[in-house]
UniProtKB/Swiss-Prot annotation:
CDD domains: AdoMet_MTases (cd02440). S-adenosyl-L-methionine binds at residues 11, 13, 38, 60, 82, 99. This is Ribosomal RNA small subunit methyltransferase A. It comes from Hydrogenobaculum sp. (strain Y04AAS1). GO terms for molecular function: 16S rRNA (adenine(1518)-N(6)/adenine(1519)-N(6))-dimethyltransferase activity; RNA binding. InterPro entries: KsgA/Erm, rRNA_Ade_diMease-like_C, rRNA_Ade_Mease_Trfase_CS, rRNA_Ade_methylase_Trfase_N, rRNA_adenine_dimethylase, SAM-dependent_MTases_sf. NCBIfam families: ksgA (TIGR00755). It is found in: Cytoplasm. Belongs to the class I-like SAM-binding methyltransferase superfamily. rRNA adenine N(6)-methyltransferase family. RsmA subfamily. The gene is rsmA. SUPFAM superfamilies: S-adenosyl-L-methionine-dependent methyltransferases.
Length: 252
């Protein structure tokens, strides 16, 4: 039995019931191409492998685990790659699932959102605190909340206590479902991300002190007071009106 590696942030799910429940959330159909990120010892893979589908792709960075998966799941496509860099451009209507490593979740999630046009649905297990910040509309929301919710409807499925993992983490996990929105903006994603990061830095600043040509109705507001629709509207309006959106360059 392979031991979890701290360098990869590995915590292996050991409950078959929970694994089955997570896989069922993905709603796999016969014509679906499914990608699993970080299969580990195969808790989710076992159930995915049994389902009728077009193709199952396993993305695993750990070479030791990759070798075991290659022997066990011969009818799956295996990629020994970093999920934060994997290219999805040759696929469409992907369904993606995974227990994301606590120390790599952000880079993986960003890579998936960057390629959202190739994705129809995602189901991810994350640290509970992280998951809650992705679905909140409170003052605790972040730039990643805005970025993810621009392209996906996200809902909280259930929590998973640490005792169901090996080794036992100090935090509780949760499962989120990301359903691709039908109408998404055609923003240039890197520019939009940069805008969001700057907007959410110095978050107590009023917008009139951060943005050039901001409309009066937003001037005295802070980013934490804005809805997602407000944020998208401001970006779309200012990026079309003036490339020099910010009054200065706030630290990221």
């Amino acid at each position: 039995m392979l031991k979890p590696k701290k360098t990869f942030g590995q915590n292996f799910l050991k409950s078959k019931n929970i694994a089955h429940s997570i896989v069922e959330l993905l709603d796999v159909k016969e014509d679906d191409t499914v990608i699993e990120i970080g299969p580990g010892l195969g808790a989710l893979t076992e159930f995915l492998y049994q389902k009728p589908k077009k193709e199952l792709i396993l993305v695993e960075l750990d070479k030791d685990i990759f070798g075991l998966l290659e022997k066990k799941y011969k009818n799956a496509t295996l990629l020994n790659e970093d999920a934060s860099l994997v290219d999805l451009s040759s696929y469409k209507n992907l369904k993606i699932i995974g227990n994301l490593p606590y120390n790599m979740y952000a880079s993986i999630l960003i890579n998936m959102i960057n390629q959202e046009k190739h994705i129809s649905k995602m189901v991810f297990m994350l640290q509970k605190e992280v998951g809650e910040r992705l679905i909140t509309d409170s003052k605790d929301k972040s730039w990643l909340w805005a970025y993810a919710n621009t392209y996906f409807n996200i809902h909280y499925a259930f929590s998973v206590p640490g005792r169901f993992f090996e080794p036992v983490p100090k935090v509780t996990s949760c499962v989120l479902v990301f359903d691709k929105k039908e109408d998404t903006p055609s923003f240039e994603k890197q520019n939009y991300m940069d805008f969001l990061k700057k907007m959410f830095s110095n978050r107590r600043k009023m917008l009139k002190h951060k943005l050039n040509n901001i409309e009066d109705k937003y001037a005295l507001k802070r980013v934490e007071e804005l809805s997602l629709e407000d944020i998208k509207y401001i970006y779309n309006t200012l990026s079309c009106f003036n490339k020099n959106i910010f009054t200065s360059t706030p630290a990221l």
